[in-house]
Amino acid sequence: MAQWLFRPEHPLTARVQVNRQWQHFFGYGIVRTSEDLGVQSDRPTHQELLDWLSVEFRESGWKTKALQKLIVTSKTYRQSSVVTKVHLQKDPENKLLAHAPRLRLPSLILRDVALRSSGLLSPKVGGVPVYPYLPDSPWESLAITKERDFSYPQSKGADLYRRSLYTFWRRTIAPVNMFDASARQTCRVRTAVTSSPLHALTMLNDPTWVEAARVLAQRVTKEQPTDEARLARAFALVLGRAPAGPEPALLAKMLTNQRAVYAADAKAAEALLAIGESKRDATIPAAEHAALTATCLALYNLDAAITRD
């Protein structure tokens, strides 16, 4: 069967994979019903494009990274998400991709971005599931009997900072900091992407993001000599570009305000810096470190940081 699936005269395998990769980057596939691609599915919006990408994918040796590079370097992917009146009139659902779709990044990627930019992310590949920071309360209601009780054994050391791919996932409940994740009690082909106050509260208060902000603040403090350079470096690490327009002034203003807050409240500074298992550099003054931590946490929560624009 495997040989049959990958024979040159069997085009469906390549088309299905190409369509799913397209869905990953654009929010929906060239064939909208990615779970049912065939004679009963929706018709492709761009049939020739689907066929061409499928042939390219097959002839590249089924290399997924090559396919992804082809998609993300295309003019279609790199165009603006700004919607004009003409777009809304002629193609309100953007089926023809006259502009880029605007998507919130999946929570797994948001967590990995925070860990990567701060320098906490563990590069280890493979191994058993890990147990990153999670509140205990969601698990208590799942204990049917004492014998089947489950306590969450939080990981230690580098395992706390593994990629989200390796996070332990119980069938009846998804990790609570993974927004819109399926509970896996039913099969879901696509994850719904929503935006709610609960998501914002999580990213502002969850130890994962607070600790990442603290470590990022520590990192840029060591790497750069001035406030301006530190803020620019943190901005670039989180958003992948240099701050522009009014952004440098706004960041500097926030840092100044946070300095005043934590200079007047040493206990609040120490409490903020105590979040997370990683050790902080005590040579950095607490009020200064806390102020830059709060600023870095704001960077992680910017719309531009959580949205693919």
Where are these regions (language model features)?
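Active-site Gly/Thr loop motif
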Residues: 163, 172-182
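Primarily short, surface-exposed interaction patches in extracytoplasmic proteins
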Residues: 1-156, 161, 182-191, 204-287, ...
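Short, surface-exposed polybasic-aromatic patches that bind anionic ligands, especially phosphate groups
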Residues: 295
